[in-house]
Amino acid sequence: MASVSIDHGTAIFRLPDGTREERPITPEYPVEKALEDFLGRFHVEGEYANYCGLYGYTSFNAVRYFENIPVKDSREATNDAPDMLYILYQYLIVFNDFKNEMVLLEMLAPGEESELDTVQKAINNRNYTAYDFRAVGETTSPLTDEQHKVNIRQGIAHCLRGDVFQIVLSRRFEQRFVGDDFKLYRALRSINPSPYLFYFDFGGFRIFGSSPETHCRIEGRHAYIDPIAGTTKRTGDPEQDALNAQYLHDDPKENAEHVMLVDLARNDLSRNCHDVKVDFYKEMQYYSHVIHLVSRVSGTLNEDARPIKAFIDTFPAGTLSGAPKVRAMQLISELEPHNRGAYGGCIGFIGLNGSLNQAITIRTFVSRNGVLWFQAGGGIVAKSNEEYELQEVNNKLGALKKAIVMAEKM
C-alpha cells in the first residue's frame, strides 16, 4: 500500500496513489522527522486499528543517521537493501492464539471498494508449487577462527586501555542454497521457538529469524527494554544445564557485563522517560541451544517525548554494541571487516497509534540471490577469554546451523 525507506542519506516515500517523494536526511530533517511525516499521512479507524502500522526493519548501518559513526558505505548491484524499510500493508492477517481465531483486516480509503473476498479466496487456494530446500557447498566466513580471535584480543586491549568497558564483536557466515528458504524459517521456528518469530519478504531479499530479545517496546506511554547479557551453552541434559545456569548466574565477569548493560538500558530510556526502573533482574531464560541472563528495564515517557524519538535514542541496543556505546560502535566499524547490515539492528512494528514493538535482529538469516547471511557475536570485556568468546559465537549459531540441516529433510 505504501512504504518509507531511508537509504544513502535520503528518505523515500512511496504513497498509495503511486507517487514517490524523496527528501535528504539532514540535521534539520532527521530520520525521526521523516518517519513522523510519513506516519502523519495516514489515519485509521476501526475495531482493529491498533494492528495497523509500519512493518519492517532498521539495519545496524542506520546508526550513521543517529551518531557520528563512520559506517562503511557501499552501492553493490547485488545488494539494494536500504538502511531502513517500513511498509504499510493494506491487508493483514491477525492470529489470536488465545482465542484460536484468525482475523483478516483490510484498510480502505473513503469510497474504495472492498477486495476482502478476493483476498480470502487467494488465501484458501492451495494450488501452489512447493519447493525443497538444499544447502550447496560448505558454510564460509570472511573471518577464520584465528582472525576472529585476533579481533577479540584487540577488543580486550581496548578495554584494558579504558577506551571502552565492553565491546560486542561479531562474525558473519555465508551459506549458498537452492530452493525455498521459507522451509528454513519453518525449521528454525520449530528448533528455536522465541518471543519474536518473523519472515519478511521484501522482494529482492528476505529477512527471517527467531529473536529472543526485545530492542524497544512502547505501549501507551510506557517503554520497555529487555537486555540479554550473559550466555552459556544448553546441552539438553537437565543436570548439566542446571550447573551451566548456576555458573552463569554466579560468574563475576558475566554479572559485571550484565550490570553494565542494564545500566546502559536505563540510561537510554532516561533520555525520554521518567520513573525508569528495573522490573526483573538476572532472570534465566532457556532456549534450544543457549541459556540467557535477562533483565527488563521500563520507564514512562515524558509529557513531551515522542515514541519514534524514544525508539531512536535507544538504537542500537547496548547488548549488540557495547559501552560507552558510541566509542564501541566506532571501534566495531574499525575491527569488523564488513558492514553488519540487518544484523544487530531491529525488526518489527511501528503503530499508527504511537505503539511500537521492535526485536533485535539476532538468530536471523538474510536471504538474497541464493545465499544466506547469518551472524553472531559476543560481549568482550577486560577479563574475556578468547577461546570462550569464540565458542559463544558457535553456541549462538547452533540453532541456525541445525535449522539448515532440518530444512533439507522437510
Locations of regions flagged by a protein language model:
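Extended alpha-helical targeting/anchoring segments
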Residues: M1-M410
